[in-house]
Amino acid sequence: MASLKPLLSSFTNHQIKVWVLAPLLETSDANIDYYYDFSQSIAEYEKVFAELGIEWEWQPVTINDYACIIDLIAKEKDFAHKTPVVFNLCDGDEINGTPGISVVKLLEEKGLIYTGSDEYFYRITTSKIPMKKAFDKARVPSAKWKAIDDKEDIENIFESLGTPVIVKPSISGGSMGVGIKNVVHNQTELQEQVNKMFAGYRGWDLAADGLIAESFITGPEFTVLISGSYNNLKEAKIYTPVERVFHESLPEQEKFLSFDRLWEIYEEETPMPNEANFYEYALPDESLIDEIKKISWDAFVACKGCGYTRADIRMDKETGKLYVLEVNAQCGLSEDENYTSIGAILRFSNVSFTQLVAEIINDAFTRLSASQLKRRIA
């Protein structure tokens, strides 16, 4: 355990108490409850903070009580003998009742040290529309796209984007609202899918910021973890990319993360034959690794990323060109590959989950120091 202490570069383990804020959604829907089940995460963080020798507390927050809880933590800053540090896992869009950006704004307002995304990065990546605009402005390659603001607003989609097209909610996490029927080939399929998405999923609003249609990129998919801040490349870390190798039985146009198969719900889609995995992880071809890292970093910078992110990339199998699908502020964190690709990235990078958590906490202190210096100069 002592060997892990050098990881804590910005503080000592006796000076802080970490509050892990986890989003709690109060719902009676089993499918959505499963998506927000953090029981496995609690065990992981118990192990992490035991190894780091840091006092910590797991604290669920809802959209209704997050302010009271953050007020309580802020009082510790003034009166307790340890500095509170908030390890923020809240990733909601707040449209459907899950806490998210309001938590970040209040943490900033209270002057608390917190991990992960700041308000700008959170906001620009919550909806795919401002994120895609940021990619376009920075000339980061991404799939051609078109916003759909209304279910009747679907003229000239195929003329603009080609065939096939994939339709996604502009605001969505964990592949919610994305399935194999989202890949459409003609106007009839497009209209049917758009109507369905505007109707929502089990009461979940999928069209709060409209939909986005993209050219479907046929080819391999990669994912990259970045920790740090866009304006501090020296201290940032771009992890080894991994490829999601989808099951060989799947047609090319079903080789993507659909909600049904990702979360093993199987309402409309079938599991893999012989109980095989939906996908496995592998290292990309060595010749692609630096290029994948570069385009991921460019996307992170385009969105002024901070804290950490997971960037998803696809490669056109015909041209070999790489395209950014998205960057995920507040992406799920776990070393368990059944829950998130971060586990596979850590495995291929030979980095423990404890090391990653320490990196993320250190980044919060680095950002605090930079912010304090900026205020002094101003």
Regions found by a protein language model. Name each.
Residues 50, 108, 136, 159, ...:
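Anion (oxyanion) recognition and catalysis
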Residues 1-113, 120, 126, 130, ...:
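ATP-binding N-terminal substructure of ATP-dependent carboxylate-amine bond-forming enzymes
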Residues 283-287, 306, 315-378:
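C-terminal active-site "lid" helix and adjoining low-complexity regulatory extension at the edge
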Residues 2, 14-21, 76-80, 123-212, ...:
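Active-site nucleotide/adenylate-binding loops and adjacent lid/helix of ATP-dependent enzymes
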Residues 189-273, 291-294, 322-323:
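Phosphate-binding site of ATP-dependent enzymes
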Residues 196-206, 260-317, 372-375:
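A long amphipathic alpha-helix within ATP-dependent nucleotide-binding catalytic cores
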